[in-house]
Structure formats: C-alpha cells, structure tokens
Amino acid sequence: MTDPATDTTRRNVHDHEVAKFDAAASRWWDPQGECKPLHDINPLRLDYVAQCLGGLEGRRILDVGCGGGLLAEGMARRGAEVTGIDMSKAALQVARLHALEMEVEVAYRQITVEELADSDEPRFDAVTCLEMLEHVPDPASAVHACARLVKPGGHVIFSTLNRNPKSYLFAILGAEYLLQLLPKGTHDWQQFIRPSELDRWAREADLVLRSMKGLTYNPLNQRYKLTDDTSVNYLAHYQHSPARAGS
C-alpha cells in the first residue's frame, strides 16, 4: 500500500526538488552555508510581512514551503501562532528540532498546500508562501490553495523570481555560478514567474494586490534591500477580496 506521506505522483510536487531540500536540510541553520542567502534576506522578509499585516502579535499564520523554519520561527518569535508546511521530511525534522532547542512554538506538518486547503483546517489570518512557487509544477494551483486558506479579508504574501533575461543573468549565472551564493541547480529559470502571471492567478482566486516590492543584492557590500525594481526577486502582498465574506 502506498504511503500517503510519500506518494507524490498526484500531488503538486517535484520529487527532485524535494530531494534537493532533503539533502540540504542538515545545513539549513548554518548562516555561512548554502542557505546563507535565506539567512541574509530573512530580516527583510520578516519586516515586510509584519508591515503588510500591521504586526504579527496574535496573528494565526500559515507558512507554505517552510523548509527548515527560518521564517516560521521568526514570525513565532514576534508573537504569531505559526503553522509551517513542507514536503521535505528532512527539512521538517530540522525545523522541529531547532524550534525545540530555541524554545519556540511552531506546528510543522508534511502536507501540500492543496491538501491542507481541502481539509477542515480553520482558516488563517495570513498565508506566507516565500521562495516556493518556482519549485512546484503547478504554481497557479498553489496560489489558489493559499487563497482558500485565508479568512475573508485575510492576507497572502508571495515571493518568487521574475522570468526574463536579467533574472537569468543575475539569479542563475550570477548567483549560482559566478558569485556561488547558491548551489548550482538550485533554480530552473523556466520555472520563474512573471509578476503578471502571478497577478493573473491571484485575481482568479479573488486576491487583490496591495503592494509589490523587489529584492536586490549588492555584491560589493553583500547586502540585500527592498526596492521598486521587481525585475529579478520580488515580494507581493495580496488581500482576499472582502466580497468573499458575503459569499
């Protein structure tokens, strides 16, 4: 009998992507290791999420594609009630252990966002889905599932990479080959998502765009910052249409 926790044949999952994150799981919390870019951008991501939500204290938040728990733990430390989901069993094991060691409470589950949306899980105040959409075969499905998991008027925050020649130059050639910020093969440029594509899927799911910001990296000072340039990395804040409350 097939184990439902490992059967990905009919799920919105790339097995090879899960395998990559399984292999990197033990080094997830090493700020100087292959996950260094995530450590470097995490304060910016946390501040952006907090700003979009008007604070995290008391918010019930779902972190989709939580990996080893960098963002999930950060939100929990700021007072949010956080659930993190991922399909990498190894990454979740690391996330649980780190949260236990740091005495931070986060609920972690191995489940796809679509499966959670189909369950009787109570709706969340907000859903974060950062650096995840470019790693699944059907990102539109994930966007729709995220929208189904928030309360009427709830917030959904995405981050991903734009698909254009500049993003290939910076995110693939630059980040993976020249600067070696990420392991080679971390990203597939064909899986990158134009803001117009993300916005179309979001609008189909009754999500209204509230803000969009770019995330740029300066190799000279090795720092990231939020800008209005969305040509490579970008974050997008959506709110579920209040019309849903009456539906």
Curated annotation (Swiss-Prot):
CDD domains reported in the protein's UniProt record: AdoMet_MTases
EC number(s) per entry: 2.1.1.222, 2.1.1.64
Keywords: Methyltransferase, S-adenosyl-L-methionine, Transferase, Ubiquinone biosynthesis
Pfam families tied to this protein: Methyltransf_23 (PF13489)
Reactions listed under catalytic activity: a 3-demethylubiquinol + S-adenosyl-L-methionine = a ubiquinol + S-adenosyl-L-homocysteine + H(+); a 3-(all-trans-polyprenyl)benzene-1,2-diol + S-adenosyl-L-methionine = a 2-methoxy-6-(all-trans-polyprenyl)phenol + S-adenosyl-L-homocysteine + H(+)
GO MF annotation: an example: 2-polyprenyl-6-hydroxyphenol methylase activity
Keyword S-adenosyl-L-methionine assigned: yes
GO biological process: methylation
Keyword Transferase: yes
Xref: Gene3D superfamilies: Vaccinia Virus protein VP39
Binding sites annotated in the UniProt record for S-adenosyl-L-methionine: R45, G65, D86, L130
InterPro entries, per the entry: SAM-dependent_MTases_sf, UbiG_MeTrfase
Pathway assignment: Cofactor biosynthesis; ubiquinone biosynthesis
Function: O-methyltransferase that catalyzes the 2 O-methylation steps in the ubiquinone biosynthetic pathway.
Family: Belongs to the methyltransferase superfamily. UbiG/COQ3 family.
Name of the protein in its database record: Ubiquinone biosynthesis O-methyltransferase
Gene that this sequence comes from: ubiG
